[in-house]
């Protein structure tokens, strides 16, 4: 359970980045900001800053005195330990206990507030005032001139500790004017060792004067301490004698040196500039000063070491610039070299390819096919070989190629840096593939030949479409060629010629019946007789190829049937009128069947003709029998069961075509 605290309790408060700090639970004043729930208002001794902390970060002072009450190097910590013991009721309105040239009252002095020190300092001030009253007017003029010159030169001067403090106090007493620097004669009289001592001593009070609230404290909370007023600065001048630290120098801020204003204004300026150093210590706990702090701590810049450091920084910057320029030049040179090498390689590759073409042309063979397949072979060879150094056979024309490559590189560099970077990237990618380029020429030739043959085979396979595809293509060409708007007779004739040369089977024709239909229509194309004749020729070719000798047999049967009908008609005319109507009645169904209504009607007509030929016993009986036997031998499907629907359909199709051809022949005759 965390301890419950009351206002006025002394505690050690723990902040992140700070040790356990001596503090006090503070009262909440009327109108003040109320703390969040479960937090107490804390007043830190030494820094006189406030914050809100929870009970888990607070530890009773009496219990933890031995544990956390040890001296620490942190600014204000030791002063806080002294305050919590000797002045536990201190508030942020009281001056801090640290002794420095900017402390506000002599009452808060830590180890230097004795009466003996005050007496000594007062005597010192009295003697100095007596000496310096006579020379104040002269010094004012000389010092003001020196201040102006120092401002123009940009150097902040520092004086010995005792001289500056005495002259400051004398001037404050006489004319209330503060001069930040002493005349050059006094500065030149100093030895470099003394200036180094004073510069070292200037930093000692800054380490000790950590009790100022504007500076770094344990928490950047509410800062109650404000900039001291003019009356406080006057009291400071009188209280400076009560301090035993003789290492107090004139404030080196540029405001005091340039304007030569009063001591109160100079001190207030310094105090205004110092708060940024401890603005938010919670965010930056390290004790190092901020970036703004080094401005007032710069007075030793008059020494040659500071000027050397400034010049050294300038030299470093110039060196960095030079290095950057050198790197850029090196990169540009590398890019140019890479471009030249790339161009050389491309030239060499082109020459090699030209030589190979010549060799191929000399050797003979399918030169046209090789030329067609050259471009893909080029790409593959480039990828496989990489971009290594040129071989021994290609090393002779390097001089000429180098000149050409330089010219091309200059041209390629004009568009911009992007064109220069790309070949560099290609070069880097191609470097690991340098070795494969050393292959013998014969191996590459054989490999390319094999690749060319494989490509030729693939091309042949692709170029050879199926018969069905060609048939469909020719069919579409014929249709387009015989448009009503713009007929193309030549194209139609060429397509019909090619169609007649196709090796068409019955299966293909069954799938593409529309081709046969178009051929039938074109046979009656009255616009051009050549097209009609060609279509009839192609139609008969297709029939002869598909049906074979069966067509001839059917034609013979049809001719025999026609002759028989004629003979019968003659007999009927000769016979008496009674028998004629019977025979005519018998012949009526046959004539009705012979009408080409569908494929079945044509097939039935053909069958009736065959039956009649067999009954008469004429010489033409051998024809249909032979045709049927050949039909059985030619088509494997005829050997299968005739009861199947597929076989019946094929038979009907064939008989239909045969009967139509026979009818056409009869019509022509």
Swiss-Prot record:
Where would I find the Glycyl lysine isopeptide (Lys-Gly) (interchain with G-Cter in SUMO2) crosslink on this chain?
550
Tissue distribution is: Ubiquitously expressed.
| Annotated localization | Cytoplasm
Which GO biological process entries does UniProt record here?
Answer: DNA recombination; DNA repair; DNA repair-dependent chromatin remodeling; muscle cell differentiation; muscle organ development; positive regulation of cell growth; positive regulation of double-strand break repair via homologous recombination; skeletal muscle tissue regeneration
* Renumbered residue ranges of the record's region Disordered: 87-469, 558-669
- Where is the sequence biased in composition, kind Basic residues? 155-172
Q: Name one GO cellular component term.
A: cytoplasm
Query: What are the UniProt keywords, alphabetically?
Result: Coiled coil, Cytoplasm, DNA damage, DNA recombination, DNA repair, Isopeptide bond, Myogenesis, Nucleus, Phosphoprotein, Ubl conjugation
Name a GO molecular-function annotation. histone H3K27me3 reader activity
Report residue spans for region: Interaction with DPF3/BAF45C isoform 2. Answer: 466-548
Q: Which Gene3D superfamilies match?
A: 2.30.30.140, Conserved domain common to transcription factors TFIIS, elongin A, CRSP70 (1.20.930.10)
Q: Where is the composition biased (Low complexity)?
A: 127-137, 252-269
The coiled-coil regions, if any, are: 550-575
Query: For the PWWP domain, which residue ranges apply?
Result: 7-64
Quaternary form?
A: Interacts with trimethylated 'Lys-36' of histone H3 (H3K36me3). Interacts with trimethylated 'Lys-79' of histone H3 (H3K79me3), but has higher affinity for H3K36me3. Interacts with IWS1. Interacts with H2AX, POGZ, RBBP8 and CBX1. Interacts with histones H3K9me3, H3K27me3 and H3K36me2. Interacts with DPF3a (isoform 2 of DPF3/BAF45C). Interacts with SMARCA4/BRG1/BAF190A, in a DPF3a-dependent manner. Interacts with SMARCC1/BAF155 and SMARCD1/BAF60A in a DPF3a-dependent manner.
Per the entry, what this protein does is:
Acts as an epigenetic regulator of myogenesis in cooperation with DPF3a (isoform 2 of DPF3/BAF45C). Associates with the BAF complex via its interaction with DPF3a and HDGFL2-DPF3a activate myogenic genes by increasing chromatin accessibility through recruitment of SMARCA4/BRG1/BAF190A (ATPase subunit of the BAF complex) to myogenic gene promoters. Promotes the repair of DNA double-strand breaks (DSBs) through the homologous recombination pathway by facilitating the recruitment of the DNA endonuclease RBBP8 to the DSBs.
Could you tell me what this protein is called?
A: Hepatoma-derived growth factor-related protein 2
The species is Mus musculus
Q: Which gene encodes it?
A: Hdgfl2
